[in-house]
UniProtKB/Swiss-Prot annotation:
Species name: Schizosaccharomyces pombe (strain 972 / ATCC 24843) (Fission yeast)
Protein name as it appears in the record: DNA-directed RNA polymerase III subunit rpc31
Main location: cytoplasm
Annotated stretches, region: Disordered: 151-210
Role summary: DNA-dependent RNA polymerase catalyzes the transcription of DNA into RNA using the four ribonucleoside triphosphates as substrates. Specific peripheric component of RNA polymerase III which synthesizes small RNAs, such as 5S rRNA and tRNAs.
Amino acid sequence: MRRGARGSTNLGGMTWQEVLEFNANSTPTKLYPDRDIPLQRSIRPEELLELRFYKEIRTSFLDESAFYIRRNPISVVQRNEDGLVRYSDRNKPKRKNDNLSLSDLDLDPKFFPEELRKTLGAASATGRKRARRKLDMKTFIDFTIKAQDLKDESSEAAHPNIEEEPDEGLEEEDEDFGDDDDNDYGENYFDNGEGDDYDDYDGDEGAIYE
């Protein structure tokens, strides 16, 4: 007598023999059609030349140009001659892309007007750079003093000094006014009162006024 129940496999009404026969008669799925894959050929000389030109253009206009904005303009990786970036390039030294001024750039003066060449200090039409003049302090001071003198002279010419003549009539009036100072008020100011006429009194009564 068997104890317990063992697990049974439900084959959907099929026996093991039928399952084995089904697997034996099954055919594999179809694969992609056969195709001859060509081997990679070597790079031709004209392709190497095109690649070198592409690298020079990309380096001059994108990587090293002062007018190109990128996320990380601090350093530029030195690439190989074929222009491809490899994983091993991370160990190569990096060069900084410093901000260059217009005078440091290799500009062609033929593409700039004459007035812009002088302003930017670029080469002139003859191909020579504009000579820089040094500032002479003595000449600068003399020029400043001369300009100040000319300014003062022009100011004096525009507003000449007019001397005012004294008024003779006013001086005569002042003299006449000084002669009239000796009047009766000056003589009577310190009068002792001898000319006043008062009644005598004993002192017990108050002053009597007429």
